[in-house]
């Protein structure tokens, strides 16, 4: 029996059972039977709906329209697609009749109707869900926002633009927080859609909140005075700049927002001249000269981008309190050609923020319609953003991860290429570009490819090249950045079933203008050396585009006022000469402060000052006083980093709870003041979450778990290894320390990709982290000791070239500093001698990693499996 026939038979049986239940009296037993029959019917219908959705609507893996016929490059016909969509809608309607309160089914049904072009019916379904949001006392903010945004989508699709705008305004005014990892931020999408419909973008925000009347990023050459020129009315004069240039409108609207009347041409007390001049003083691309005098200001540049950055600097030099501008002069240009970030979603201030940070390259990984949900409103929003980015001369890329990562299609199928071409053309016709990730979800390679003896290193590059050429043929200005699956190198492991160097060499067939991301362990690990960059460049024939990951100092989170040592992580010349572009992977707008500091560094590498930069970034987004409000609580809040996201570990047994409580109270008070000063602080950074983590730690510390019991199975194996490798003998007074006995939170039952054995270890990270040392306490008995102690340490070094040095001390007295003796990818045991005169009755042994690094989640590190102390009876000082 074929699958459709089986499904139909199951449906008939379930329907019969359900009808029988409904015909009888509602006794408890029969009510239960009816409920079970209803669940069974829903289960069968769910299977049928899933069958339909793989070929229609917005399914998770985007098989929309495309058959899985390996020999076909054609999609389903409109007639076939319509038939499947009609069946899908019918099944979902039946499901909703059975479960009328299931919002998930209702949203899916409404989406299916939207996909089928039945917009009015979809609106009715969405409104039905919306009504249930207000039934009872509990309000589900996420469901309210989701239903109201979808209602606006349906209205817009029917041509009711004004009605859609009003619906979006209603949602915006609710100020609901719907930012969640991995799901749509409906409130952010609503605000962006409303602002685009209102024509507010690119002036939808109040940025900059405070500049101190100085340019940002730090100019290359600048002469500031303490004098200001009054501005009441301004005439804008244009030389080589068109009247309808968006840079001109941007300046006029920004002046108007400060209460300064501005007009193009005419005679006013003050004039601003914007000039594209082949003989402008700064010869560099995007460079400009800005001169601000008592009666006039002039921006001179050799290209439109230079004019834009000169306009931005003029706006930043406006007084924060008066209608005036600082008198100054600057010659300025960027050190790094392409500067930007990977954002997590569209938000209303995306374009403005990018402009004020003088960045020019942005990738949006999540956006309305990123799963193929191309409703007219979502397409409008993406198209409008792409249009405005293009008008300002900035690069905008949309990610297509739902079409590439974990797709499950063979690259040798003709339909795979056709589907990718269609999706890329969808964005290219907007004037946007595409980010194509294979990243860490490329494997396993499809069986139809491996059956032909093909691996990813054989098929990926030709596929990407064919895709790129097909789109460029239609849209010659189209750009692409491709993220291959092989992480970093040459130091980190090649963890995928392919030859890493063969794969990277295969990318040489891609043209130089098709960019390649370079990501993985060591990019997340911050520090990069020239040898590594040359390795990638030589293999691929491309300078890398950096996909900078994991920059948050607090278990990957940013607490807003942290300093970021961008220059410390990179060698001289890296930003200026050796890369094609630098993008920071970010949760936006949450991480905008740190992104602003990156923009500062990429613009003026040598002039970057990490303290000044974060102060100005915070002020730019949140106001002059916000940094000083939050900063006093940062140090104490950092103490809680050892308890990742508020989960306690064995370190709580070593910690001072009174000090932790004081640190929490200080940070909590700072946060309360910050929210009162500017509630928008809740949008940026994770300071508030950090306060919440601290509260969880203190609550859990009142009744900590039995850590020995929690890790019992790991500890038994670790203890056996220590006994075997050191001849440990408790009867002789030997002392053993396993990861639970060592301070520091980072322990794991760990297997390095290139090491065949698992071990329970404590990680000691780089010297610039809060996890750079681990302590153990021991009693010297008898005291004074008869002689020295021997220290046995089993550990492994990280995979990065060059071994970590360590420092060993007892009670603050250093008795060893130098190479650890540990090696990469193999556990070894090393012996050290502790001089007897270092010891007291009660002692504190500390192992510190001296390896330079600030990454709390990657290299440099040493992994410690155990520590054993033995009495020697020998006195080394004699």
Regions found by a protein language model. Name each.
Residues 23, 194-305, 313, 317-331:
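Acidic, contiguous N-terminal accessory segments
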Residues 342-516:
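Aromatic-lined carbohydrate-binding surfaces of glycoside hydrolases
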Residues 751-759, 769-773, 784, 795-869:
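Beta-strand-rich ligand-recognition modules
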Residues 204-213, 723-783, 853, 857-875:
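Glycan-recognition and processing domains
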Residues 57-60, 197-200, 211-225, 425, ...:
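Substrate-binding groove of N-acetylhexosamine-processing glycoside hydrolases
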């Amino acid at each position: 029996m074929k699958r459709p026939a089986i499904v139909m038979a199951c449906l008939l049986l379930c329907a019969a059972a359900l009808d029988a239940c409904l015909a009888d009296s509602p006794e408890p037993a029969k009510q239960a039977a009816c409920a079970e029959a209803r669940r069974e019917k829903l289960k069968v219908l769910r299977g049928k709906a899933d069958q339909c959705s793989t070929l229609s609507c917005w399914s998770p893996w985007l098989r929309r329209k495309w058959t899985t016929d390996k020999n076909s490059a054609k999609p389903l016909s409109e007639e076939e697609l319509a038939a499947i969509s009609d069946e899908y809608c019918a099944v979902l309607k039946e499901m909703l009749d059975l479960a009328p309160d299931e919002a998930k089914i209702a949203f899916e049904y409404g989406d299916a109707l939207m996909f089928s072009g039945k917009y009015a019916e979809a609106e009715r379904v969405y409104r039905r869900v919306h009504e249930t949001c207000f039934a009872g006392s509990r309000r589900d903010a996420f469901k309210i926002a989701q239903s109201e945004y979808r209602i606006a989508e349906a209205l817009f699709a029917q041509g009711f633009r004004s009605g859609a705008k009003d619906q979006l305004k209603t949602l915006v005014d609710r100020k609901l927080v719907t930012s969640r990892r991995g799901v749509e931020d409906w409130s952010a999408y609503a605000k962006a859609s409303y602002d685009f419909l209102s024509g507010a973008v690119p002036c939808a925000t109040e940025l900059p909140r405070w500049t101190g009347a100085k340019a940002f990023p730090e100019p290359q050459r600048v002469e500031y005075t303490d004098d200001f020129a009054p501005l009441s009315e301004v005439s804008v004069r244009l030389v080589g700049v068109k009247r309808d240039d968006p840079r001109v409108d941007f300046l006029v609207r920004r002046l108007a927002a400060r209460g300064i009347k501005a007009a193009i041409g005419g005679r006013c007390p003050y004039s601003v001249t914007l000039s594209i001049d082949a003989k402008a003083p700064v010869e560099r691309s995007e460079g400009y000269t800005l001169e601000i005098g008592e009666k006039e200001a002039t921006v001179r540049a050799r290209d439109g981008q230079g004019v834009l950055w000169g306009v931005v600097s003029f706006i930043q030099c406006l007084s924060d309190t008066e209608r005036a501008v600082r008198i100054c002069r600057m010659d300025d240009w960027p050190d790094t050609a392409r500067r930007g970030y990977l954002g997590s979603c569209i938000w209303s201030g995306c374009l403005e923020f990018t402009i004020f940070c003088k960045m020019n390259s942005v990738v949006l990984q999540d956006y309305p319609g990123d799963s193929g949900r191309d409703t007219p409103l979502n397409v409008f929003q993406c198209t409008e953003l792409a249009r405005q980015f293009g008008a300002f001369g900035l690069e905008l890329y949309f990610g297509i991860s739902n079409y590439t990562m974990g797709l499950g299609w063979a690259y040798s199928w003709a339909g795979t290429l056709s589907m990718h071409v269609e999706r890329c053309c969808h964005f290219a016709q907007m004037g946007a570009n595409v980010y194509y990730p294979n990243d860490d979800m490329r494997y396993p390679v499809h069986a139809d490819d491996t059956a032909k003896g093909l691996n990813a290193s054989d098929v990926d590059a030709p596929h990407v090249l064919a895709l790129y050429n097909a789109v460029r043929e239609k849209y010659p200005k189209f750009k692409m950045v491709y993220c291959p699956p092989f992480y970093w190198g040459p130091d980190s492991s090649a963890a995928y079933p392919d030859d890493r160097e063969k794969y990277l060499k295969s990318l040489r067939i891609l043209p130089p203008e098709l960019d390649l991301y370079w990501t993985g362990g060591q990019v997340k690990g911050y520090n990069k050396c020239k040898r590594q960059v040359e390795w990638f460049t030589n293999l691929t024939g491309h300078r890398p585009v950096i996909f900078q990951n994991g920059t948050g100092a607090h278990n990957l989170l940013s607490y807003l006022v942290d300093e970021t040592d961008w220059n410390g992580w990179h060698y001289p010349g890296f930003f200026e000469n050796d890369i094609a572009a630098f993008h920071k992977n970010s949760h936006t707008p949450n991480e905008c402060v740190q992104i602003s500091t990156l923009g500062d560094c990429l613009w003026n590498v040598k002039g970057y000052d990490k303290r000044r930069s974060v102060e100005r970034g915070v002020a730019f987004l949140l106001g002059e006083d916000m940094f000083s409000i939050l900063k006093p609580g940062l140090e104490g809040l950092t103490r809680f980093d050892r308890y990742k996201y508020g989960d306690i570990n064995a370190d709580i047994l070593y910690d001072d709870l009174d000090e932790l409580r004081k640190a929490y109270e200080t940070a909590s008070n700072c946060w309360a003041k910050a929210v009162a000063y500017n509630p928008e602080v809740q949008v940026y950074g994770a300071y508030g979450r950090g306060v919440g983590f601290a509260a969880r730690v203190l609550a859990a510390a009142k009744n900590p778990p039995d850590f020995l019991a929690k890790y019992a199975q790991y500890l038994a194996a670790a203890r056996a290894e220590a006994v075997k490798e050191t001849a440990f003998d408790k009867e002789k007074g030997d002392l053993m320390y396993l990861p639970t006995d060592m301070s520091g939170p980072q322990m794991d039952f760990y297997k390095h990709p290139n090491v065949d054995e698992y071990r329970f270890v404590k990680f000691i990270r780089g010297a610039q982290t809060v996890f750079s040392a681990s302590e153990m306490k021991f009693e010297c008995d008898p005291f004074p000791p008869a002689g020295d102690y021997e220290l046995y340490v089993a550990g492994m070094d990280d995979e990065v070239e060059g071994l970590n040095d360590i420092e060993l001390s007892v009670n603050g007295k250093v008795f060893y500093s130098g190479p650890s003796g540990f090696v990469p990818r193999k556990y070894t045991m090393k012996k050290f001698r502790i001089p007897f005169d270092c010891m007291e009755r009660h002692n504190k042994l500390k192992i510190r990693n001296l390896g330079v690094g600030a990454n709390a989640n990657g290299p440099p590190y040493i992994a410690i499996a155990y520590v054993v102390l033995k009495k020697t009876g020998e006195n080394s000082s004699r």
